């Protein structure tokens, strides 16, 4: 089975930063809009799978009103992976835009919010149109759920392949 760009991207991030304890996921969005719920759904799945540092879940979304305050509490030495929904071309719906750099939340709807993350994942949940809010509101929940499962699964797979060797070394005897 061929690995996706999302999987390859996350494997490279996990190889560079294998300690799960040093990773913070900032999952941006709201539970009040189908398309914009991608981030909080991923955050909820990651939290349920045992990730300790997750900002933005369905219970406590990290949306345009709270994102600036939420990221102020992140430790300086943390590796931040920002996750958000976005709109794109009709051909790109269901795909992911990944970057070795920050994400600018709210850009699709004209909001000016600070860039977030050392790495970023944007899920293209619908086609861009003249009314971005409407496009996000009318996004398929089935598509969003599938993309969220794919993202959370790829994250877990990447870090399970790149275990923190220092944690295992305490059980090894010198040769």
Question: PLM ranges: what are they?
Answer:
Residues 1-80, 85-175:
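N-terminal catalytic or cofactor-binding beta/alpha core of small enzyme domains
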């Amino acid at each position: 089975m061929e690995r996706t760009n999302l999987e390859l991207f996350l494997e490279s991030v996990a190889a560079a930063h294998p300690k799960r304890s040093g990773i913070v996921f900032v999952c941006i969005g709201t539970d009040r809009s189908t398309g914009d719920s991608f981030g909080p759904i991923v955050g909820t799945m990651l939290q349920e799978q045992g990730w300790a540092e997750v900002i933005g879940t369905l219970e406590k979304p990290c949306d345009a009103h709270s994102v600036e305050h939420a990221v102020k509490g992140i430790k300086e030495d943390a590796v931040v992976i920002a996750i958000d929904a976005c709109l794109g071309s009709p051909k790109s719906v269901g795909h992911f835009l990944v970057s070795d750099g920050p994400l600018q939340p709210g850009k699709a709807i004209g909001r000016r919010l600070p860039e977030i993350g050392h790495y970023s994942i944007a899920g293209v949940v619908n086609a861009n149109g003249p009314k971005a809010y409407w496009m996000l509101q009318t996004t398929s929940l089935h598509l969003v759920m599938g993309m969220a499962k794919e993202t959370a699964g790829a994250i877990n797979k990447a870090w399970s392949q790149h275990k923190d060797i220092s944690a295992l070394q305490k059980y090894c005897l010198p040769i």
